Regions:
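Cysteine-nucleophile protease catalytic domains, especially the papain-like/related folds used
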Residues: 8-127
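Non-catalytic, low-structured ubiquitin/UBL-interacting segments
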Residues: 1-6
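Active-site signature of cysteine proteases
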Residues: 126-142, 147-260
Length: 260
């Protein structure tokens, strides 16, 4: 779990980068065998751009070299998790840059995944009840990491806060009833979560501000439905095992006796 508030260079607006970093750590861990082959074939690609370490460090101050990488190249301002994923892997989207030397960056895995391709295919804004459930079920079935943004999660208000979903529970109708999510700002929630990495939270479905219109997925608030946090954005990241296998052959997925 990556904390967006522990770094001293200013990152209070960079939850988008912290959420993307969480997803990228998952991605590189499960693609480690393919990445080793990639590095053997393309040891200096992309030329002139140094990739951050993928080692996840077990200390609060410097857990994620990937997140540090984003902090050192982007200004402390709002951004997009979806853009960050595609930019890091293939330069398929843009991110705000404070370092102009990276404006021609082609992506760290462009030799296999392609340059300027969308590894994360789309960002869903304002998902309906049915669309939210469709995306969660598909992502969990197809081994995809899930990024999301919810309004009102940090200090109230309507500003979206970016986080990641890693699991779900379903009710008797097959709808998501609880999510297991990681909040990169959960240092503010240590008492409530008792130090847990994943937070289990009930989902509700109702119109925005209970004002009519279609049902929207909300993270339930203990203060009542008027304080529930609507999920306003979703994106997913697949492992791209088909592209890896086309280049290097089929390898077993770590921790799974099946192959892709």
């Amino acid at each position: 779990m990556i904390e967006a508030w522990n770094y001293d260079s200013g990152d209070g607006e960079m939850c988008w980068a912290a959420a993307a970093s969480n997803m990228l750590h998952w991605w590189v861990a499960l693609n480690a065998d393919y990445i080793e082959k990639y590095d053997n074939e393309f040891p200096s690609s992309p030329s002139g751009f140094t990739r951050p370490s993928f080692d996840y460090k077990d200390n609060v101050e410097e857990q994620s070299p990937i997140f540090r990488f984003f902090i050192e190249r982007s200004p402390n301002q709002p951004g997009s998790t979806w853009h960050s994923l595609n930019w890091f892997l293939t330069a398929g989207n843009y991110i705000p840059l404070s370092d102009s030397r990276w404006k021609d960056f082609p992506g760290f895995f462009c030799e296999v995944l392609g340059n300027k391709t969308l590894v994360s295919p789309e960002e869903i804004t304002g998902p309906s009840r049915s669309k939210f459930n469709e995306i969660i079920k598909s992502a969990l079935t197809n081994r995809q990491a899930i990024g999301f943004s919810a309004s009102g999660m940090q200090f109230g208000g309507t500003v979206p806060h970016a986080m990641t979903i890693w699991g779900a529970e379903f009710d008797e109708n097959g709808e998501v009833s609880y999510i297991y999510y990681v909040d990169n700002n959960d240092g503010f929630l240590q008492d409530a979560t008792e130090g847990s990495v994943c937070i289990r939270q009930k989902m509700t479905y109702h119109s925005l501000n209970n004002g009519g219109g279609y049902d929207v997925p909300h993270i339930q608030s203990s203060l009542g439905p008027n304080y529930d946090s609507p999920i306003v954005r979703l994106c997913v990241l697949g492992l791209e095992r088909d592209k890896w296998a086309k280049k290097y052959g089929v390898l077993p997925l770590p921790g799974d006796d099946r192959t892709e």
